[in-house]
Amino acid sequence: MSPQIATNTDVGLEQLLEFVRLRHHMVLITSRADGSPQSSPVTGGVDDSGRIVIATYPQRAKTKNARRRPEVSVLVLSEEWDDAWVQVDGTCEVLDAVDGPEALDGFVEYFRNIAGEHSDWDEYRQAMIDQGKSLLRITPARWSTVSTGGFPPQDS
């Protein structure tokens, strides 16, 4: 079996978003109050405005950290461990379901872009309020190459 050679592919914003849209396993990296990093495995997607979106709860460390310091990073992983990944750095906006229609529309868009249509959107909106959910919307500012792990390429 031949060794896997590492790859690094530069991408523009549209290519980045296409890559992320197909992947929902992510690690969100925020900053604790003392400045140290805090990592959270999450499920995420891309909304119609090109923001990475993650549903969570206001009591979670990631949400508190993002409210305090909105500069975050998201490591987007493929389904297979040895497949491609990318790091996206950006600014995070936190919306709470109880904030009203804009937040609830954001949750609908989040669900649609990850899982498709819901059988009852009014029921879904009410569930987001009842559960006290928060939505993180991250606007990409910069990103790494889309990369795969492996052995370094041999110089010719």
Label the model's feature ranges:
Residues 1-11, 84-156:
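Charged, gly/pro-rich active-site loop segments
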Residues 13-14, 45-46, 117:
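Generic signal for short, ordered secondary-structure residues
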